Amino acid sequence: MFDSNHEQELSKRRTFAIISHPDAGKTTITEKMLFFGKVIRVPGTIKGRGSGKYAKSDWMNIEKERGISITTSVMQFTYKNILMNLLDTPGHQDFSEDTYRILTAVDCCLVVIDAAKGIEERTRKLMDVARIHNTPIITFINKLDRDSRDPIEILDEIEKELKLHCIPISWPISCGKNFRGVYHIYDKIIHLYKSKFRKNFLTLDSFLDGSLNEYLGADLSIHIRQELELIMNVYSKFNKEKFLKGITTPIFFGSALGNFGIDHLLDSLIKWAPSPLYRQSNKRIIKPQERKFTGFIFKIQANMDLKHRDRIAFMRIVSGQYTKGMKLTHVRIKKNIIISDAFSFLAGERISINKAYPGDVIGLHNHGTIKIGDTFTQGEEIKFIGIPSFAPEIFRLIYLKNPLKQKQLKKGLVQLSEEGTVQVFRPILNNDLILGAIGILQFDVVIERLRIEYNIDAVYKKVNIVLARWINYGNHHSLYNLKKSYSSYLAYDISNSLIYLAPSSANLNIVMSQNSDISFNATREQ
């Protein structure tokens, strides 16, 4: 049954991801948001091995041991009567392509930047993916209570490297040990950081009439007035339409560890982030207001519960609404199934649900039939597009210490591959198993999970591969010629798509020039 309050449910939902480079403070921000959403009572920080205290969003065993985020957690909380669907992506330098795919399931991104370091490598790569969909970006410049770069310098870097026009919403009053707070340009309020006075904020009147000297001192008061005058003359005013098109980014400053500025971010998500957006299918645009249910799978996690050895498929609802016990069509395999046990998430915890709406992320039990990119509908034969696989950047040959466990190894690798941890390739000329990943840590994750979850001891050998490109060919004669000349470089991935594994960029360029009627692609649609 379709709710009459469907539009209202849409208007009070925000689905967003937090992305950053390692150690920019993303997990601390996540926890503080959960604190504001009253999901956790006391915000904590990630602790090292043996401390026994870990971030709420870091629930996998290896994450707890190493004190880093290497998977993607989905969390739902309410803030000021708005339902927030937060997808917490790994912040560690070496994460999987699963992180990239998460960005296809959100309507907005919060980018966290370390004020001392500015734009870093992983932030650039994640922004390249976000830009494919023109995802709206809100930027938080963190750690102002530590030694920092000049704020204007950071904004210049954002505009140059991320190709976003910066719109400062708040502005810092000094930094490091002298950090006194921020001036909210649009609310015209000065928020004081760890004020020695009873007031936590000052109105614009006190900013103008000189009484600010009492709180900041005469020299700093004069400096911040001059700086703000410059900022408000140089940078444009906030325009929501340009923000929603991914042209501009509102800028906030603060300290997540000091619990300062997080409420400003949440308020901006409520005011400016879009409610659930439409998605493109292979046949038409699907709007969230439509009555019929549609959704797509963007992530699979194997063995979230070791006691049950289960596999969970994460589905983003696009249109209609989920109701417990409803019948859905699994389009790829053309099979109707009844969904009676979907649930929502709080990190590793599951909460059974009776209803869910567009923008929500729900979990489905998966017995091996659901794959990343699968579409579910109420009968319509469509497929959502824009959920790609990305070519790995690092490669290893994996083999067993005990060759008798080859069957278990293949099963474990299939599951880990289907959830996006690594990609598995089978050379067409031999029985080797080659793994490909975005970051080196993923290989450690695979070895650890094979040992803990499948009781398999495996090791790696280096392999002479530096690039991978999926092959699309127009006719079988072209493919025959390629296989005839370069069969030793060809392999199949887990979906039996042909891929070229190049030992060097020069080799790839030569092969491409000799086979101009074949396309070599860095991404593959699921």
Curated annotation (Swiss-Prot):
Keywords: Cytoplasm, GTP-binding, Nucleotide-binding, Protein biosynthesis
InterPro entries: EF-G-like_DII, EFG_III/V, G_TR_CS, P-loop_NTPase, PrfC, RF3_C, RF3_dom_3_sf, RF3_GTP-bd
Species assigned in the record: Buchnera aphidicola subsp. Acyrthosiphon pisum (strain APS) (Acyrthosiphon pisum symbiotic bacterium)
Cellular location(s): Cytoplasm
Nucleotide-binding found in the keyword field: yes
Taxonomy, superkingdom: Bacteria
One MF annotation (Gene Ontology) recorded for this entry: translation release factor activity, codon nonspecific
Similarity remark: Belongs to the TRAFAC class translation factor GTPase superfamily. Classic translation factor GTPase family. PrfC subfamily.
Domain tr-type G: 11-277
Name the UniProt record assigns to this protein: Peptide chain release factor 3
NCBIfam families assigned: prfC, PRK00741.1, small_GTP
Gene Ontology CC: one annotated term: cytosol
Signal peptide positions on this chain: none
HAMAP family: Rel_fac_3
Entry-linked Gene3D superfamilies: P-loop containing nucleotide triphosphate hydrolases, Peptide chain release factor 3, domain III, Translation factors
Binding site for GTP: 20-27, 88-92, 142-145
Gene Ontology biological-process annotations: regulation of translational termination
Annotated Pfam families: EF-G_D2 (PF22042), GTP_EFTU (PF00009), RF3_C (PF16658)
Any coiled-coil regions, as ranges: none
